Structure formats: C-alpha cells, structure tokens
C-alpha cells in the first residue's frame, strides 16, 4: 500500500520566528522500515511524538491509514530509549496490561497465551514472571519491544531503543527485531544516531537538517534528503560491509552529518 503514513508540510515552532523545522513532508508505505537521522535538536523526536499522538505540530498534518493522527492510539506502538515498564508489575503483567487495553473482552487464558507468544519472540520466557528490577537493560528493552508487538499495532515507532545498550546486546536485539519485522511485515519508523544501525535495518533513511543562520537570516531545519537503501533486504550485521554499495552509502550519510555539524 502506497502512502500508508503521510506527513504533509509539518512544522514545529517554540518561538514563532524560529521554527525547529518546517515544511517536512514524506510518506511511508505499509511494511516499510524507515529510519530518521540528524543532529540533536533537529526535531526527530518531535516528529515521532507527533506520529505517536503525544505532541502536536505547529502546522501541517500527519495521516495514518487515511485518518489524521489526533492523539495516542493503540494502532501505534511506541518503544522509547528508556524501557518505560511499570516497576511493580512482572514482565507478564506489563505486557498483559497493554493487551487488555487493546482487547478488553479477552479472558485471562487467552491473554496469557498471547503474552507468552510475544515474550517467546524476544527470548524471555524464562523471565516472564520477573519484575523489571530483576532484569538487565537489554532484557527490559526486549520487554518493551514485545509489549509493542503484542498489541499488533498498524505502525511501530522506535525512539533510539538501543542507544543505552552495549554493542553486543544492541546487535543481538537488532537481529531479533529484524526477524520479527520480517515475520509480521510490520511498518516501522525509527530514530537513530547510529549510521550502521540505519543501514542494517531500514529500507529508506531520512536525513534531517538543523535550523541555522544563513547570511543573517534564520533558515528552519527540515528534511534535507531521503536516501534509498540499495542493499539486499535479507542482510545481516556480519554481511553488511561485504555488500557492494555499503561504503558508498555509509560515506554519503557520514559526509552529510559532518557537513551539517560544521555548519553549526
């Protein structure tokens, strides 16, 4: 489906004369994985929060599946960098809470089967009755991912979900996420600062620019470029740097980020 998510001329301004970004427009197709990259302050998280219904734009519109986004919805699952688990509930109970919200008519046995299926998808069945305080950082993020998938959202929104994890744990969960996305054909919008992570996971990469003074005039930030990822979709981390075109793609994105950093 073309244009499952549509962003039209989105802008956000905390000060009227200096919008953080302006005139941001893009589409995401159903089943597509799109990453957004840019320096801090360019508005990446603001855009994600607008898509999640947690913030409003100063102008412009965001549509998903033909309907304008006007507030939070269980049609969109969100995973933040911080795990956002309820500390007094177990893994099972944290996910069951979300499942009950989506399907209030379900009975406990049906909820448990559904929860266990999604906990198993992220390899945490042995820890299903533990509380967050008993889990490592990587395990908590796995729970967050399982919870997001468990409500079967039309779209998954990820705000640097692996940013606080060590490299080994991050790589393992990236692999798990890729497997689940392929299995479910999930539509994903993800913020990352990691160029290799974006190349590994995404079908397209959105490059954001920051607002800046140019010849004494303020120019808002915005969507500077949309980069198509030409690498085969069934790629793995180990294969990544062997693919023709990998270094050209990586260098292009790094050059963009370096040039924008110098502009500041």
Predicted regions and their residues:
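The feature captures the beta-strand-to-loop junction immediately N-terminal to the Walker
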Residues: 37-39
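Helix-to-loop junction immediately C-terminal to a conserved catalytic motif
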Residues: 52
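Short coil-to-helix segment of the ABC ATPase nucleotide-binding domain corresponding to the Q-loop/switch region
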Residues: 89-98
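Conserved ABC ATPase "signature" region
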Residues: 108-127, 179
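Conserved signature/switch motifs of ABC ATPase nucleotide-binding domains
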Residues: 130-133, 151
């Amino acid at each position: 489906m073309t244009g499952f998510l549509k962003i039209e001329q989105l802008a956000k301004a905390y000060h009227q004369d200096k919008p953080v970004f302006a005139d941001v427009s893009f589409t995401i197709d159903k089943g597509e994985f799109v990453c957004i990259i840019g320096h801090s302050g360019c508005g990446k998280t603001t855009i994600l929060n607008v898509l999640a219904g947690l913030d409003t734009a100063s102008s412009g519109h965001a549509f998903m599946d033909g309907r304008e986004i006007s507030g939070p919805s269980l049609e969109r699952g969100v995973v933040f960098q911080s795990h956002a688990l309820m500390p007094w509930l177990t893994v099972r109970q944290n996910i069951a809470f979300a499942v009950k919200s989506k399907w209030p008519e379900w009975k406990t046995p049906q909820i448990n089967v559904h929860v266990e299926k999604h906990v198993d998808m992220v390899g945490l069945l042995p820890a299903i009755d533990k509380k967050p305080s008993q889990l490592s950082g990587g395990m908590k993020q796995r729970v967050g991912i399982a919870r997001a998938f468990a409500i079967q959202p039309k779209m998954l929104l990820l705000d640097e979900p692996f940013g606080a994890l060590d490299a080994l744990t991050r790589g393992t969960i990236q692999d798990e996420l890729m497997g689940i996305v392929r299995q479910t054909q999930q539509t994903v919008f993800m913020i990352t600062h990691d160029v290799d992570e974006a190349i590994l996971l995404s079908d397209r990469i959105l490059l954001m620019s920051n607002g800046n003074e140019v010849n004494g005039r303020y120019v808002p930030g915005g969507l500077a470029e949309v980069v198509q990822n030409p690498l085969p979709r069934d790629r793995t981390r180990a294969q990544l740097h062997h693919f023709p075109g990998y270094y050209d793609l990586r260098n292009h994105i790094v050059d963009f980020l370096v040039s924008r950093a110098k502009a500041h």
